[in-house]
Amino acid sequence: MRNWQLMPAWAFILGCVCFSPWASFAAEWQDKAEAEGKVVFYTTANTSDAKAITDSFKKLYPKIDVQFDRTTDSQMMEKILTEARAGKPLWDVVSTTGFYGYLLRKRGLLAAYDSPERKYFRAGFKDSQGFWTSSYTTYGIFGFNTKLVAKANIPRSHEDLLKPAWKGQIGIEGRAYEWFTATISGMGKEQGLSFMRALAAQRPNLRGGRTLLAQLVAAGEFNGTLTSYMHNFDTLKASGAPVEWVALAPSFANLHPVGLAAKSPHPNAGKLFIDFMLSQKGQEIVRSLKRIPDRTDTPPDPPTLLQGVTPAFTSPEVYDDFDRYIKLYQEIFGVK
């Protein structure tokens, strides 16, 4: 019925994570990092995920205090810029989404760090000059309510969503700019913009937040959503909600770059933390949190999850013209 299989419900038990001698890579930094005694991590991951990662690092390196600050992409960017203007950066490591990682790199706010773990990450999932590496990627899917959508009406392509049966029955995120740009990049500009305009004519329901959209689909407020992630629906399905999802080609893919602050207060601790996040054990933790790790020797769960999927990433050229695409999105979907 769909391209991917569902991931099983996750259970992360911190005390059962056994760390192997991967840390030999980090020996160069450990003494200096422990002397610094602290690392500050800015992230857009949800609080429970951030805590699982930082608690695991703290267990491995008890002499280093780990502090994390979780917020949205735009709020985090503003905080980083405010600190930079004041000449008092407080953060060491950042984990954000693709566009904001691009902005941080472009504005000179990231330091190059060629972690020894980066060799396990493919081109396209890391900056060629070492400024960031993506720790995991989230993939967009079409999620729907199984009580409201008959099997015959389950979409097999984006074009299927332009049929009369879907008019007024699709939810999209009110500021889904990366979904918009990645889908256009994947389809090709002319075809992509044509699809977006046709989708807007279907009178989609605009809401704030991918998790909320999935919840509204489960509640039957509308039949499906095009801008949520796989894990949004897996979580609901595990709780018994009448939902399912399919991957439509191209599937929006959002990298999650990890990078070191250009003026890190604790640079050695920051490097050690990045090594940990990119290590196989760190990536196994990412996988246990129902995310799809980007490290090549750490397959998703199940390993066949991405078979047949055509990912679409926003191109650097589009990022360079991102403001214009935001205006296009607002114009096409009537967002003020």
Where are the regions that the model predicts?
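Bacterial N-terminal signal peptides
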Residues: 8-21
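Extracytoplasmic ligand-binding site segments that recognize negatively charged/polar headgroups
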Residues: 27, 40-54, 66-84, 89-221
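Short amphipathic alpha-helical coupling segments at ligand-binding clamshell hinges
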Residues: 53, 191, 195-198, 256, ...
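A ligand-binding cleft/hinge motif common to bilobed small-molecule-binding domains
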Residues: 98-103, 223-242
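Periplasmic-binding protein-like
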Residues: 123, 137-138, 166-175, 196-200, 205-207, 277-299, ...
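A bilobed periplasmic-binding-protein/Venus flytrap-type ligand-binding module shared by bacterial periplasmic
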Residues: 141-148, 184-186, 254-266, 285-286
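Extracellular/periplasmic bilobal clamshell ligand-binding domains
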Residues: 300-336
